[in-house]
């Protein structure tokens, strides 16, 4: 994985701006083959620099920008403040899971510096990282709706936050599943190079954790995505093993009429009394990137205090009468989709 990233960055360096050739000037009959590729046989012209070669340089540019954004985020006041917010939540969450090796509060109090793991070598130079040791409690991560990070600085910063979070929690990148229906082929290849697992199907947020403690990272996603996620894990056992970093549920309650929330997003409406929420800090540098973002977790004590009737209702959401859905449906499952 590190070799692939290094190769991509070599391409980026090789693609430094050059003087444009006059349109009236005829191109050379043969060009040198790109590194790692055979030259065209004699008597046949080599193909001009095509999309694949351009992609190689473009992926290097994206990787370099991610690396630069990561360095800026890592030294920012926002990162340290947001990390403290996540710390407070995960401390309680992992204590609830009865992690065998100490508590997360002890772990945060004994941070140590280490070098980046090999899979995150996105550039030749590196900066020290604080690594968390979470004992035998192995977390997984799912990321929905990160956006077009190759072209959007907001999405790129949200991705770099995810990468730092994975590193901090010692979640292997291969144990982080990522999906956005708007990903370009370039972005999918970059994510593969970074080592995360790109999902091939639009789950619409309907992913069961299957008993595995999981952090869901889904910033600025459509409300239906959160509602679907809750439906897919609608039990005390499953919800108590989940952490959701995403749109503030309190904010949703304040913005939406109660009848709209209960009708269109019933699982969000029913879980409001069964969760705890900590808001992300707000700084001017990252105001537009992490606004309206909170960390949510589900204490067992609160979940068990909810009415039994709440757990018996498990009808799958369909949103047929919901306006302004704000998510892209899976066409194979969407009854309104046409061939």
Swiss-Prot record:
GO BP term, example: regulation of circadian rhythm
Q: Has the keyword Repeat been applied to this entry? A: yes
Tree of life domain: Eukaryota
Q: Does the keyword Translocase apply?
A: no
Q: What induces it?
A: Up-regulated by hemin and 5-aminolevulinic acid.
Span list, region Disordered: 1-54
- Locate the compositionally biased regions of type Basic and acidic residues: 30-47
Which family does the similarity line name?
Belongs to the SRR1 family.
Q: What is this protein called?
A: SRR1-like protein
Organism classification: Eukaryota, Metazoa, Chordata, Craniata, Vertebrata
Q: Which gene encodes it?
A: SRRD
């Amino acid at each position: 994985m590190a070799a692939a990233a290094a190769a991509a960055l070599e391409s980026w360096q090789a693609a430094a701006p050059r003087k444009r050739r006059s349109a009236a000037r005829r191109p050379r009959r043969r060009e040198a083959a790109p590194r790692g590729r055979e030259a065209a046989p004699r008597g046949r012209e080599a193909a001009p620099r095509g999309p694949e070669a351009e992609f190689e340089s473009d992926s290097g540019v994206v990787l370099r920008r991610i690396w630069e954004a990561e360095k800026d985020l890592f030294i920012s006041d926002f990162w340290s403040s947001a990390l403290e917010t996540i710390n407070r939540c995960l401390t309680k969450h992992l204590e609830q899971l009865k992690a065998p090796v100490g508590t997360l509060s002890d772990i945060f109090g004994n941070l140590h510096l280490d070098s980046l793991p090999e899979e995150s070598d996105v550039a030749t130079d590196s900066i020290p990282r604080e690594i968390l040791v979470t004992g035998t409690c192995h977390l997984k991560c799912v990321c929905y709706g990160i956006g077009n990070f190759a072209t959007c600085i907001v999405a790129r910063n949200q991705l770099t936050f995810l990468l730092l979070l994975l590193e901090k929690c010692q979640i292997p990148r291969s144990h982080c599943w990522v999906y956005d229906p708007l990903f370009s082929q370039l972005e999918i290849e970059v994510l593969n190079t970074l080592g995360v697992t790109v999902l091939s199907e639009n789950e619409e947020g309907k992913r069961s954790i299957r008993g595995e403690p999981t952090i869901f990272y889904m910033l600025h996603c459509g409300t239906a995505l959160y509602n679907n996620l809750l439906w897919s894990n609608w039990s005390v056992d499953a919800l108590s093993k989940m952490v959701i970093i995403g749109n503030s549920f309190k904010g949703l309650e304040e913005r939406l009429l109660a009848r709209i929330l209960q009708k269109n997003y019933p699982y969000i409406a029913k879980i409001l009394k069964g969760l705890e929420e900590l808001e992300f800090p707000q700084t001017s540098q990252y105001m537009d990137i992490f606004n309206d973002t909170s960390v949510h977790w589900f204490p067992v004590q609160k979940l068990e205090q909810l009415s039994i009737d709440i757990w018996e209702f498990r009808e799958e959401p369909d949103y047929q009468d919901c306006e302004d859905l704000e998510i892209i449906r899976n066409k194979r499952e969407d009854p309104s989709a046409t061939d």
